[in-house]
């Protein structure tokens, strides 16, 4: 495109000519304990051939979801992931925080958290994931990287609501696959319903609990087969 990469610094203004045939693209960043969030740039086209833009600090980023007011308990977690480009809404102005999270939606969030380029992932082993489905490249990315194995050798159940124990398994595998160290600082807890946790999910649940990624329900249970809501998923991923 003729332009060089630029290292932006706070407090420094940069001017670059942009014609109407050109465009600028926001490349989302990741907000976690070890990676600093990138800046978001707004591009305002003027009447002439020049354009102006400014760096917007994370706190200034417009938050569009009217169903997630600042008073809602999950607001800071949802906003953190939204600012980082990890999550999007069900519509332009709603997030549906209390709705159940589907398996396809969750792997999409994991890909966003990783900052993965899923454009090359177009085919997969799951017969219930059409190649032209919006979630197909995300599911394929997750499968090829060992984050998910599916509900069977050939099925993923993308539209099914994800259970809390399956969420734990995906997050645990995600951490393993991408070298995310899970701490062990939190004392181990035996959930009141530990016996209800499937054998395949128990190691993941225990590891995430010791890492402080999950803490269970207020009554001391984990409710492994209960569905995870969209806001609960944001709380989990913001802890990574």
Explain the meaning of each model-derived region:
Residues 9-12:
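A glycine-anchored, Pro-Gly-centered beta-turn/N-cap motif
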Residues 22-51, 142, 208:
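Structured interaction patches on ligand/partner-binding surfaces of diverse proteins
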Residues 46-75, 88-107, 111-138, 144-168, ...:
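Feature responds to low-complexity, polar/acidic, surface-exposed segments characteristic
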Residues 79-84:
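Mature N-terminal segment immediately following signal peptide/propeptide cleavage
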